[in-house]
UniProtKB/Swiss-Prot annotation:
InterPro entries: CWC24-like (IPR039971), Znf-RING_euk (IPR027370), Znf_CCCH (IPR000571), Znf_CCCH_sf (IPR036855), Znf_RING (IPR001841), Znf_RING/FYVE/PHD (IPR013083)
Taxonomic lineage: Eukaryota, Fungi, Dikarya, Ascomycota, Saccharomycotina
UniProt entry tagged with the keyword Metal-binding: yes
Annotated segments matching region Disordered: 19-38, 43-68
SUPFAM superfamilies in alphabetical order: CCCH zinc finger (SSF90229), RING/U-box (SSF57850)
Family that this chain belongs to: Belongs to the CWC24 family.
Subunit and interaction comment: Associated with the spliceosome.
Protein name: Pre-mRNA-splicing factor CWC24
Length: 216
């Protein structure tokens, strides 16, 4: 439980004191050498610090390799804004710009719009009037003739192209024969595309000459 006391010899203590004195005598010499080494290191650092800024701006880009030059060109091209890359030869792009965004395209192409008078776009057919010769457009005919001209679109509403073997349904609307049969047989829709009345599959052929005369 209790620690034993160790009696130290006086000789050991004297030797330690002698060693400490010798170390203290050698210490100033080591301090002097350390100071000298520090001074030399500081002088070297100052020299290097003076030389480095002179050498840094003198590194021209011409000494860089071709790969580095190519990389610099790529970075400079990316930094430029508003420049487009050349298109690939195997890619073709078509751009369609709408110069009349306020005009109803369905009414302009076919002469019919499903929204009718509630459509928020303009119902204008100026371009279609230029294609078809107009005779005495300023004269106003009978009200019945005007109604007939307004009801008949100048193109098929289903395929949006010129009439091919046109037919008339029971409700009085005109379509292409192939378009009407495709809608009636394949899609199994027996109602009229314009007025949504039942047609029962009945259709009457219409003469193209008479149809072109009644169109606007």
């Amino acid at each position: 439980m209790f620690k034993k006391r160790v009696i130290k010899d006086s000789r050991v203590s004297k030797r330690k004191i002698g060693d400490i004195n010798e170390a203290s005598e050698d210490a100033p010499d080591t301090q002097v050498t350390k100071k000298s080494t520090l001074i030399t290191k500081k002088s070297d650092i100052q020299k290097k610090s003076v030389v480095m800024p002179r050498s840094s701006p003198q590194t021209p880009l011409s000494k860089s390799s071709s790969d580095d030059a190519a990389a610099v060109e790529v970075v400079s091209q990316k930094s430029k804004k508003g420049e487009l890359k050349p298109l690939a030869a195997n890619i073709k792009t078509t751009i369609i710009t709408d110069f009349q965004p306020d005009v109803c395209k369905d009414f302009q192409q076919t002469g019919y719009c499903g929204y009718g008078d509630t459509c928020k776009f303009l119902h204008v057919r100026d371009e279609s009037r230029q294609k078809i010769p107009i005779k005495k457009d300023w004269e106003i005919g009978g009200q019945k003739e005007v109604k007939e001209k307004e009801d008949i679109p100048f193109k098929c509403v289903l395929c949006k192209s010129d009439y091919k073997s046109p037919i008339k349904t029971e409700c009085g609307h005109i379509f292409c024969k192939a378009c009407f049969l495709d809608r009636y047989k394949a899609k199994k829709k027996g109602t009229c595309f314009i007025c949504h009345k039942e047609t029962n599959g009945t259709m009457v052929p219409v003469n193209i000459d008479k149809l072109s005369a009644t169109q606007v």
